[in-house]
C-alpha cells in the first residue's frame, strides 16, 4: 500500500488534530513550569519569642523550640561535606533542605537549612539534634548569637 502511494506520487497524508496538539503542548508547559517552580520555592524564617523561637518554613511544617529545652548549642562549619545524608521525611529542592534526616554523624535529626551555606547552628534539644542555618555565614552566626543570648536570660 505504501509503495503504491509513493509510485503514484501521492504519499501518505498525516492528519493531526490541532486541538489535541494544543492540549499536549499546554500540559507539557504546565509540567515544566511546575517543576522549575518547585525546584526554587520555599522560605525559612526564624521568629524569636520571649520563651521560644519558631522556624517558619514555607513548603514544610514549622518547628518551635523552647530556649530552656536546649541542652547544647554550637556553630559548626562544613559538616555535610563528606557524609551520606538521607532525607527520611521532609521537603528539599535546590535551595532548601527541611525535615527529618539521617547520617552517620548525627544519626536521626531535624534540619532546616539553606543549601548554599556551609555554616550551621547545631543544637541538642531534649535528646534530639536540630540543625539550622541562614542564607549565608553572617546570618547563621546571627542566629547562633540570638539563640545563645536568649538561652542565657
Give residue spans per PLM region.
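Alpha-helical transmembrane spans
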Residues: 1-43
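Terminal and domain-flanking low-complexity segments
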Residues: 1-5, 9-11, 114-153
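A signal for specific C-terminal beta-sheet/loop modules enriched in small/flexible residues
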Residues: 12, 62-85, 138-153
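Short low-complexity stretches enriched in small and charged residues
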Residues: 21-32, 49-50, 77-91
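A short linear-motif detector with a strong N-terminal bias
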Residues: 24-27, 32-35, 43-44, 50-53, ...
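Conserved beta-hairpin
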Residues: 35-67, 72-74
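Non-transmembrane, membrane-adjacent beta-strand/coil modules in membrane-associated proteins
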Residues: 57-65, 72-126
Amino acid at each position: 500500500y505504501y509503495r503504491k502511494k509513493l509510485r503514484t506520487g501521492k504519499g501518505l497524508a498525516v492528519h493531526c488534530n490541532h486541538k489535541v496538539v494544543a492540549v499536549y503542548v499546554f500540559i507539557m508547559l504546565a509540567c515544566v513550569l511546575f517543576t522549575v517552580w518547585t525546584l526554587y520555592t520555599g522560605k525559612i524564617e526564624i521568629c524569636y519569642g520571649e520563651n521560644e523561637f519558631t522556624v517558619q518554613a514555607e513548603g514544610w511544617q514549622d518547628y518551635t523550640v523552647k530556649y530552656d529545652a536546649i541542652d547544647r548549642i554550637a556553630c559548626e562549619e562544613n559538616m555535610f561535606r563528606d557524609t551520606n545524608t538521607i532525607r527520611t521525611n521532609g521537603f528539599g529542592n535546590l535551595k532548601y533542605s527541611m525535615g527529618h534526616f539521617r547520617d552517620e554523624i548525627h544519626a536521626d535529626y531535624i534540619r532546616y537549612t539553606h543549601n548554599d551555606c556551609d555554616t550551621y547552628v547545631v543544637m541538642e534539644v531534649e535528646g534530639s539534634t536540630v540543625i539550622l542555618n541562614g542564607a549565608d555565614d553572617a546570618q547563621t552566626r546571627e542566629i547562633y548569637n540570638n539563640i545563645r543570648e536568649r538561652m542565657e536570660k
